């Protein structure tokens, strides 16, 4: 997911997407402990997508405060 796509999302969509990705990350981490993953790099991309989403959320919080 690119930053431009993320910035186009509404605030509630950002929150929903973060929750969805965190659930997927949890499931993949759990499965990686018990079996080999088909796409081990998916964990990295999910982690980075979560970071991008949270960065945009924080930028919006700071912009709302007037910083």
UniProtKB/Swiss-Prot annotation:
The keyword Transport does not apply. The keyword Ribosomal protein applies. It holds the Pfam family Ribosomal_L29. Keywords: Ribonucleoprotein, Ribosomal protein. PANTHER family: 60S RIBOSOMAL PROTEIN L35/50S RIBOSOMAL PROTEIN L29, LARGE RIBOSOMAL SUBUNIT PROTEIN UL29C. Belongs to the universal ribosomal protein uL29 family. HAMAP family: Ribosomal_uL29 (MF_00374). This is Large ribosomal subunit protein uL29. It comes from Gemmatimonas aurantiaca (strain DSM 14586 / JCM 11422 / NBRC 100505 / T-27).
């Amino acid at each position: 997911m690119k930053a431009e796509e993320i910035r186009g999302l509404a605030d509630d969509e950002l929150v929903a997407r973060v929750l969805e990705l965190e659930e997927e990350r949890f499931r993949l981490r759990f499965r990686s402990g018990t079996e080999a993953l088909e796409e081990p790099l998916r964990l990295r991309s999910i982690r980075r997508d979560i970071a991008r989403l949270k960065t945009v959320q924080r930028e919006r919080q700071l912009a709302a405060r007037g910083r």
